[in-house]
């Protein structure tokens, strides 16, 4: 059972309570703190669209602490981040691995950050399928196309040559925050909020 903290605010009309995620949303903060799957993707996409409708000119802040997950769910978030008008600033806290790292890198250029003790991991897409040989072949071809697409996007977002990306994602590739900055996955390592 997951417990969600409640925040109580004083207003001129009295007290109002929010779950913590709703309160963060009021400040244009979205928190992705679990595996990327269809449910979490739907929630993140809905929040992105809501915040765009609220104010299309104000940045949105996506905090990421995720081990990764579904490629199709992650691509729904990625495409929405690129589609909406506001810049989406991404901030890694803890770990951004696999699709989590991909979404971290998908933030607006100049607005992709990690806290100093964060870890970022990139690798090639994982897939598993069983069944008839013909169906296995179909799925193998699909995952190779997805791998090419993800590599191409990572190359574009990091500035790394495609051949470097292909080599570097062959196995789990863990980076500390400063290494991720040098690689181009993020733009800066931050230690405190700007005052």
UniProtKB/Swiss-Prot annotation:
One of its GO terms (molecular function) is ATPase binding. It is found in: Cytoplasm. Its main location: cytoplasm. Its EC number is 3.4.21.92. The gene is clpP. This is ATP-dependent Clp protease proteolytic subunit. One of its GO terms (biological process) is protein quality control for misfolded or incompletely synthesized proteins. It catalyses: Hydrolysis of proteins to small peptides in the presence of ATP and magnesium. alpha-casein is the usual test substrate. In the absence of ATP, only oligopeptides shorter than five residues are hydrolyzed (such as succinyl-Leu-Tyr-|-NHMec, and Leu-Tyr-Leu-|-Tyr-Trp, in which cleavage of the -Tyr-|-Leu- and -Tyr-|-Trp bonds also occurs). InterPro entries: ClpP, ClpP/crotonase-like_dom_sf, ClpP/TepA, ClpP_His_AS, ClpP_Ser_AS. GO terms for cellular component: cytoplasm; endopeptidase Clp complex. Fourteen ClpP subunits assemble into 2 heptameric rings which stack back to back to give a disk-like structure with a central cavity, resembling the structure of eukaryotic proteasomes. Cleaves peptides in various proteins in a process that requires ATP hydrolysis. Has a chymotrypsin-like activity. Plays a major role in the degradation of misfolded proteins.
